[in-house]
């Protein structure tokens, strides 16, 4: 089995209907597919996920689309937070692991490929930042971040949490001391999954 899908299978074993969808921009599907997110890493990516959920009634009758959780790590963490902030009508709880929250703070070799130079045109960065959406949170959100993350630095989660607090929006933050972008310690990784499971069961009922 592909190790990338192990955690998804584990959540399925716990009774969840698990859906994995490659949205516009997912690597490995050709340059035209990647160009679909040029100057906007948010809108089309999110709408692709919404479209998949809308088709679930036909694809998987057991799925309850009134109780949808979304979880992800890194870009997937960004997408999970984006989903509950901008489409809380569709996504009812989110788990954002090591999320980018403002692309201005991420590596330029990645961001400028898709969003251009912010010194020339900052509009794509402003439009895809989660900071301006903090006031919109109406769904449960769990933020997880390794404090030693040298890829997506912990400042991303800290600034989003600060913005949510300033907007009076309750949320949960799980800092991982000594952990980098991923969690190499098996015991920590296992307990992290159990924590996410508890969060989803508690918030989705």
Where are these regions (language model features)?
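Serine-hydrolase catalytic core recognition
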Residues: 1-205
